[in-house]
A protein has these predicted regions:
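Aromatic (Trp/Tyr) and acidic
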Residues: 1-179
């Protein structure tokens, strides 16, 4: 997701600095395509932000990898099954066609219990590049962080891209605090 947002940001900078004003409309259109990608117009039909259903997303990210949100946590693991799930607005790493199990798999992870975790999961494996995504929060040796871990790099790239369409003249409507 960071790569997608950074590509959109290239067009934002191109437009912002008027590098070729004849192409500004095209740059705006391309930026909006990248924003739409993050908001669900992508091969997975998934809004790549956590817990966005209450804000109108048809299908948003329900779980991400994070050391604090341990798999099966009754409080934080998954929006659908935990008390809270991850907070709204986290962005997972995104599709990763290079995801793989740890090198200790299938039989050198230190114990039979660990070796039993060495299951190839499909997806993300054996999928086209942009479909190589799965929502899960399993640590070593499945290494779900390669797909679902959030990072400041992805968050900031998305926010920079999103800032390209923010209407600076927006006003707050007193009823229901909605942006006009």
């Amino acid at each position: 997701n960071q790569t997608k947002c950074n590509h959109g940001n290239l067009y934002q900078v191109y437009h912002h600095f008027n590098l070729n004003t004849a192409n500004n409309a095209l740059a705006e259109k391309i930026m909006s395509h990248y924003i739409h990608y993050m908001h669900g117009i992508n091969p997975n039909a998934l809004t790549y932000l956590t817990k966005m259903s209450a804000l109108g997303a048809d299908r948003s990210v329900n779980t991400i990898y994070h050391g604090w949100f341990t798999e099966g946590s009754a409080l934080w693991d998954d929006v659908r099954t935990s008390t809270y799930g991850p907070a709204p607005g986290f962005i997972p790493g995104g599709p990763n066609p290079n995801w793989s199990l740890d090198g200790c798999c299938p039989s050198s992870c230190g114990s039979a219990v660990n070796n039993n975790l060495c299951n190839i999961t499909n997806p993300p494996s054996n999928q086209p590049a942009l479909k190589s995504y799965k929502e899960w929060n399993t640590g070593w040796p499945q290494n779900s962080w390669e797909v679902t871990e959030n990072s400041i790099y992805s968050q900031s790239a998305y926010l920079f891209l999103l800032s390209s369409i923010v209407n600076q003249s927006a006003s707050i409507i007193p009823i229901a605090n909605q942006i006009e």
